[in-house]
Structure formats: C-alpha cells, structure tokens
Design a protein with these regions (language model features):
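N-terminal "arm"/small-domain region of PLP-dependent enzymes with the aminotransferase-like
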Residues: 5-74, 203
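PLP-dependent enzyme catalytic core of the Aspartate aminotransferase-like
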Residues: 59, 63-67, 71, 98, ...
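Conserved N-terminal alpha-helix of the aminotransferase class I/II PLP-enzyme fold
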Residues: 63, 67-111
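Conserved PLP-anchoring active-site segment centered on the Schiff-base-forming lysine
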Residues: 118-137
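Active-site phosphate-binding strand-loop segment of PLP-dependent enzymes
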Residues: 151, 155-207
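Active-site C-terminal subdomain of aminotransferase-like
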Residues: 201-204, 211, 216-321
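Conserved PLP-binding catalytic core of the aspartate aminotransferase-like
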Residues: 297-304, 311-346, 356, 360-361, ...
C-alpha cells in the first residue's frame, strides 16, 4: 500500500453512521423528482430538493431537452473557447442577460465552477476578496484559488464588514462576495447595507443568486431585483440546477467584465461546454418561470404556510426568509438520527453538519417547492414533531 493510500486506511467516520443505520447519503431515487419520490421501494415526501419552482419533471422541459438531443447530439466534445459553442448556448446567454438585467453573461457547465473560476480570474495579488462566514463552499474554493488577500466577516454582521473594510486601502480593488440567499439557514444577505458600504469604501460586489432565482424578485429574477439593487451589484452569479431544472451556471455583469472573463476564466476555457439537452432544459425553464408568475406565488403560499406551522409547533427555525427552513437540532449524532427516523416515517430531509455549520448549529434542512401541497406540509410537520419531541429537541 502506498503512502497516499495509507493516509486513508483508518478513515471510517461514515462507517460509524452506517453501522448505526443512520447514514443519510447517496440514497437512490427511482424515477422523476417531484414532491413524492420512490427510494428503495419506499415512497417519501421530498422536502430535500432545491427544485423550488417544481419544474424538474415538467413535460415541456423534458420535450425541449429531447429536441436538443435529437438536433445536436449528446455532447459538444470541447470547450466553449474552441469547438464547443452552440447557437443554443449563445441564445441562453442572451436571454439570461436580459432576464437578470446585465449587459452580458457567460454560461458554464456547473454553478460551482462559476465561483471557482470567476473569483480567481477577477483578482490579483494586490486585491482583496471579502466574504461572509457562511458563503457557499464554491465561493470559499474560489477565493482560495485567487492570489488576492482573503478576508471574511461574521455572518450578516454589517458592523463587522465595515470593521474589515476600514482597514483596507481606499485605492485597492476590493470585491465583496456574498450569497443572496444562504443555502443552509435560508436568510438573506443584507444587500442594502452592503451597497451602502460599497460606496463608502469604494468596493465591488458579487452576489451568488443560486437560491434566489425563481424565488425572489419580479418573475423570479432574484434577491438583487427583490431589493431593487441590480444596478448596484457588479456581478450576479446563478445556477441552472435549482429553479431552472437543469445543470450549469452563469455569471452576468457589464460587457467589459464579461469580455475579460470570456478570455481568462479557466473553468470556462478548460471545461467542456454544457450538454445540448441541459442547455435547452434551462432555456425552457427560464421561459416558463417568466410566463407563469402563479408558480412563484404558489411557492410563497406553501412556504408561508409551512413557516407558520413550524412556528406553531415550537420548532426552532432561525431567521429564514425563504423556502429553505432550518430545523435546528444542535447535536451532530441526533441530526443523523432525526434524518433517518424522518426517512422511515416517509419524509426526506437533509442533515446539515460540520463543516457546513458549527457543531452547535447542526440542523435538518427542509425545503419547499411550488408543487407541494398544504396537506403534504401537514403530514411532514406531524411526523417531524413526533420525532423531535421523542428526541427531546422540542417539547
């Protein structure tokens, strides 16, 4: 056995949870994702999905993907930089730019690769990147790859952000990178305050709208639109794997910035372009959310109902303002146990443990789709309350 393999010989943390029959990962779904799914012959209510608009099984999107597969084939066999650009990619970029309200955008193969590639491309060794403590892992990896000096501030603490900015040279390039909606806790970035600090300290802002698009703003344009601050935010990132029922991501900005990124962003230049089917699916989903505002209203109706029910039943749900509802457990082992018991009771939810949160902040993440019904919410709340009470988490 080599030295590398020797390092991992004693890594058995997952096996501890497997032996206790509470291991929650890599469960196989046997069919389309919807509000109910089949897993191992077991039907469960799906409250673990990021498909906020409920479009992943929509026949119009499936048909669009099939048509693209027939016309273009299964893949592009190259990067966008060389032989991998389809007219379909360009059409999606034009429509995303218009939808978001920016001059231009780039579409990449995953949302993760957007943050991983854009942040290093933008910044050099004399620049500064400033991030919220709870920014997504893709932002964390992006700033680690950048040569810029890396700073962070306490979660949504504007006084702490100002403390950080006060110490930086006024003339230096300073990029604040923040999630619009925080993916585990469901709260929103304080964009109005961040924009004020941008002007006070001569900064730029990049907002990750992965969990904001299809949820907030006019026709689901995101948190920047929700606050009326699209023009104040320099770069807006988004993903196609959540509300847009596909896979991929984008970065939208002014023409000059996108022109620069198109020729320097390594995850764009050196990755194969997104598949025709995935591109067509995202494009069709974008059309649907603009044509069907009632879909977003349905999402908010069921979200507000679920928030009310969880509060009434005594769950600790933090400061969420979105369809992401954190149900705090505050114990790692109990978080795994609650997840396993919920699955056995017919409710699929996701455990959130370190490093995604601090050990004292563990939770199960409950997320809603526009297609969920109040009856499904009620069934899940009843099942989860029984488990939380039995485990001594709530009374």
């Amino acid at each position: 056995m080599g030295q590398l393999q020797e390092r991992f010989k004693h890594y058995r943390e997952p096996q501890k949870f497997m032996e206790a029959d509470v291991y929650p990962y890599f469960r196989e779904i046997e069919g389309k994702q919807g509000t109910e799914v089949e897993m191992g012959g077991h039907k469960v209510l799906m409250f673990g999905s990021n498909a906020y608009t409920g479009l992943t099984g929509d026949q119009r999107i499936i048909d669009a993907a099939k048509a693209a597969l027939d016309k273009y084939g299964s893949g592009c066999a190259g990067s966008r930089f060389l032989n991998g650009t389809l007219d379909l990619h360009v059409k999606l970029e034009k429509e995303i730019s218009k939808f978001i309200g920016k001059d231009d955008c780039l579409c990449l193969s995953t949302g993760f690769s957007v943050n991983q590639g854009v942040i290093p491309a933008l910044l050099s060794k004399d620049d500064y990147v400033i991030c919220d403590d709870r920014d997504h892992a893709s932002i964390v990896d992006g700033r680690r790859l950048a040569f810029a000096r890396q700073l962070h501030y306490k979660h949504n603490d504007m006084a702490d952000l100002e403390r950080v900015l006060q110490k930086l040279p006024q003339e230096a390039i300073k990029l604040i990178v923040v999630d619009g909606v925080f993916s585990m806790e469901g709260d929103l970035a304080n964009l109005p305050a961040i924009v004020e600090l941008k002007h006070k300290y001569n900064c730029s802002i990049m907002v990750d709208e992965a969990h904001g698009i299809g949820v907030f703003g006019k026709q689901g344009r995101g948190v920047c639109d929700h606050f009326g601050l699209t023009d104040e935010v320099d770069l807006i990132m988004g993903t196609f794997s959540k509300s847009l029922a596909s896979i991929g991501g984008f970065i939208a900005a002014d023409w000059d910035t996108i022109n620069y990124l198109r020729h320097t962003c390594r995850t764009y230049i050196f990755s194969a372009s997104n598949t025709p089917a995935a591109t067509a699916a995202a494009l069709e989903a974008l059309h649907i959310i603009q044509q069907e505002p009632e879909r977003i209203q349905a999402l908010w109706d069921v979200t507000n109902y679920a928030l009310k029910r969880f509060r009434e039943e005594g769950f600790e749900i933090g400061e969420t303002e979105s369809p992401i509802i954190p149900l705090y457990v505050r114990d790692v082992d109990k978080t795994f146990l609650v997840t396993a018991l919920a699955f056995k009771a017919g409710v699929f939810i996701n455990p959130v443990i370190p490093p995604a949160c601090a050990p004292q902040d563990t939770l199960v993440r409950y997320a809603l789709m526009a297609t969920h019904t109040k009856e499904q919410v009620d069934r899940s709340v009843v099942a989860l309350k029984k488990i939380f009470v039995e485990q001594g988490i709530i009374k």
